[in-house]
Amino acid sequence: MSNKRTSVEQLISCPICSRKVFFSLINSHLDICGKEKSKPSSRPQTVSSLLAGPKKRKQANSEKFIDLENKDHEIKPGLKSESDDIEIVENESKRFKAAPSTDFAKSIVEPASSRDQLHNDYESRWLQKISHLPLSEKLRPKELRDYVGQQHILSQDNGTLFKYIKQGTIPSMILWGPPGVGKTSLARLLTKTATTSSNESNVGSRYFMIETSATKANTQELRGIFEKSKKEYQLTKRRTVLFIDEIHRFNKVQQDLLLPHVENGDIILIGATTENPSFQLNNALISRCLIFVLEKLNVNELCIVLSRGIALLNKCRKQVWNIENPLKLSRSILEYVVDLSVGDTRRALNMLEMIEVSTRERKADEEELSIDDVRDIIKNNSSNGLNTYYDPKGDNHYDTISAFHKSIRGGDENASLYYLARMLQGGEDPLYVARRMIRIASEDIGLRDSSLLPLAVAAHDAVMKVGLPEADLALAQCCVALARAPKSVELYRAWKKLRAMMSENMYSLASSEIPMHIRNAPTKLMEELGYHKGYKYNPDYIEGKVQQDYFPKEVLEKCPNKTDLKFLDGKHLGDKEDPDLRQSYQG
């Protein structure tokens, strides 16, 4: 049978056994079913057995996964598929399903070779259909039980989101997390699972999903979706789940357009974003949605995904690409790929696909791949090396610069250097880092070592004149010098206190008149009006000391406690003692 089909062949029901069979195979299947139907049953059938029907598929916790805790484990070819069912999707309105391995199907006495042949035909057609897709798309889960990760919201014990979908309910929500953690897959599975739950329990609503992206959707398209959702509910009582990828790219007008339709239930909004919603989304929209934070997948979870990818690639090798030599990767190689992926499932699968393509011509008798082999493959096919997820305008930008500043303030020169390296590798603007170090020199070192401010300015000039990568050491030098320097926040606290008093016009600090004797008198008229009159020029006196007020008279009169005007208290640091530090000394 040819695997090169231009379209999906229709599945029809067998009139004898009710199984789904491809149209071209129905005649041979009827011959087998007819012969077996005429044979006497090997065991008596009761009414209850006839009514029982096919048994439910085993739950996810009964699946046998690879022992990923075994460090010496190797992924072997021919791993069991995550699901015996083969699902063929032509478009959103047509979905065909064949389940040749259910207990009900197995109860039909059929030669093993015929069953295997049918199963192989189904699988070959499915593999041929998806062979052009990226591996991440091939492995996209079809059932919620196949979804990997995010147990903090999907756990059956205390997962908030799981409680909703168990009741067949989907709330409007924002899925916030880094790339490659499964935001789109989760949204699709929520819609499917909630609809199934509501059908089984007769509680909740039925749903259908419309997907769009904020990078291409406009107000006209959104209005069309809202109108379609109303008509859909009137005709079928199905509620519309509107999934918007990269929702943070919507402007204020587009976000406001969503508000009334989310409010009155015309749509259920699921937005996916890699940016902090509190920075990028309107407060009104946030108040109408639940915020779920999706976390990066850990090593064990990513190894599960990679093992599934290897199993699928080996099937494609054998049945589509006619390559007999299977791909074998050890646990240590999987962990190496996981480390490079930085928690991004899509990136990990892309690297796995790169390894698979690069090893198709390897002979079966060659030595198994080592970490050095994989490192060379990735290095030769990636000009940029390791690319960590770092958005110069997103949360990582603010989180990393905050960690950098606090590490310098705490005097940890190694941590300071580490965060500097993370920012530069992630593509942060080096001038932004240099400007922050200028601020640190005044805020955290201040009067204890005034030479650090010119050093920070010099580092900024070095970046301006030389640029990266040559100026990286100038930034590192300034970073370490700031971390090692003695700290003083006397100036910072004094300035902060004064600004707070000025903002409230305390003691008329912001509105009082400047004293006449310390005003300038550049003209004769101003001199006649009393400007500069009575001013004592300090250099004319011994040690420059004179009795003279510099604060406005109104301020001095309104301030009963003159110590409030002493903004600089002479204390470089505070007087608190850290109990954790005391315990570490005692230990």
Curated annotation (Swiss-Prot):
* Cellular component annotations (GO), alphabetically ordered: cytoplasm; nucleus
PROSITE patterns assigned to the protein according to its UniProt record, in alphabetical order: ZF_UBZ4
Query: Which family, according to the similarity comment?
Result: Belongs to the AAA ATPase family. RarA/MGS1/WRNIP1 subfamily.
Which cofactor is recorded for it?
A: Mg(2+)
Give the location in the cell: Nucleus
Stretches annotated zinc finger (UBZ4-type):
11-38
GO BP term, pick one? DNA replication, Okazaki fragment processing
Q: Could you identify this protein by its name?
A: DNA-dependent ATPase MGS1
Keyword terms, alphabetized: ATP-binding, DNA damage, DNA repair, DNA-binding, Magnesium, Metal-binding, Nucleotide-binding, Nucleus, Zinc, Zinc-finger
* Cited Gene3D superfamilies: 1.10.8.60, 1.20.272.10, DNA polymerase III clamp loader subunits, C-terminal domain, P-loop containing nucleotide triphosphate hydrolases
Task: Output one GO MF annotation.
Answer: zinc ion binding
Q: Which organism is it from?
A: Saccharomyces cerevisiae (strain ATCC 204508 / S288c)
Q: What else is known?
A: Present with 1180 molecules/cell in log phase SD medium.
Q: Where does ATP bind?
A: G177, P178, P179, G180, V181, G182, K183, T184, S185
- Where is it mainly found? nucleus
- Binding locations of Zn(2+): C14, C17, H29, C33
Q: What does this protein do?
A: Involved in the maintenance of proper DNA topology and chromosome integrity via annealing of single-stranded DNA breaks. Modulates DNA polymerase delta during replication or replication-associated repair. May function as a modulator for SGS1 when DNA is damaged.
Q: Where is this region: Disordered?
A: 35-62
Origin, by domain of life?
A: Eukaryota
Give the InterPro entries listed for this entry: AAA+_ATPase, AAA_assoc_2, AAA_ATPase_RarA/MGS1/WRNIP1, ATPase_AAA_core, DNA_pol3_clamp-load_cplx_C, MgsA_C, P-loop_NTPase, Rad18_UBZ4
